[in-house]
Regions:
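Short, surface-exposed secondary-structure edge patches
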Residues: 11-16
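Feature captures the catalytic cores and cofactor-binding loops of soluble hydro-lyases/lyases
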Residues: 31-32, 36-159
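Short, polar loop/linker segments at the starts of domains and inter-domain junctions
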Residues: 17-18, 73
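Active-site/ligand-binding-proximal alpha/beta "capping" segment
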Residues: 88, 164-184
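Short, structured beta-strand/loop micro-motifs enriched in basic residues and often containing a Trp
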Residues: 1-9
Length: 184
């Protein structure tokens, strides 16, 4: 089923999404990769405020290439999500609405998604140039010293993703394998 949603993503919206749904996101999302996640964890350990509010926001695991003239961003393909698994449960517990990446997630992340009524989306790896066409603007908002891994605020329109883990814990990567085996 194709869905069009607007970020930030509320728990109510997350509940309507199901593993396997094709979703087009409009609105504001943020980027963060390994180094930014590590720095956010260190910030929380010091008892300081994060550079962005987690509640209902979307983090896209992506570090863009340089923008061509006239474009807000360069190639913007997803990063392997499992690299953020040690940080994700804490951010989900702070209210993170959704994550976008590629690949499988740990059981701890899946449990945190269910516990918090969140969702994990996958974007197509290798399609970064095409995905960048859905990004209307890009602004570094934190950790500028991290270069491509700085946290960016993106405005997106019709950004294509697939629900991999929904708020009930259904996991497309697991169900698709079972469906394939039944068909074989």
């Amino acid at each position: 089923m194709d869905r069009h949603i607007t970020a930030p993503i509320t728990k109510e919206t997350a509940k309507t999404l199901h593993a396997g749904d094709y979703v087009y996101i409009a609105g504001t999302i943020y980027t963060a990769r390994d180094a930014a996640h590590k720095r956010m964890q260190e910030t929380l350990q010091r008892g300081e405020a994060l550079p962005l509010e987690m509640k209902e926001n979307v983090i896209y695991y992506m570090g863009p290439s340089p923008a061509r003239e006239g474009r807000p961003i360069g190639s913007a393909g997803p990063t392997t999500a499992s690299r953020m698994d040690k940080y994700a449960p804490e951010l989900l517990d702070l209210g993170l609405g959704a994550m976008i990446g590629k690949g499988k997630r740990s059981q701890e992340v899946k449990d945190a998604i269910v516990r918090n009524g969140s969702v994990y989306f996958a974007a197509v790896g290798g399609a970064g140039a095409l995905l960048s066409k859905c990004i209307l603007s890009s602004e570094v908002i934190a950790y500028d010293d991290l270069g491509t891994e700085a946290i960016r605020k993106l405005q997106v329109k019709d950004f294509p993703v697939i629900v991999v883990i929904d708020s009930e814990g259904n996991n497309l990567y697991e169900t698709a394998i079972l469906d394939y085996k039944r068909e074989s």
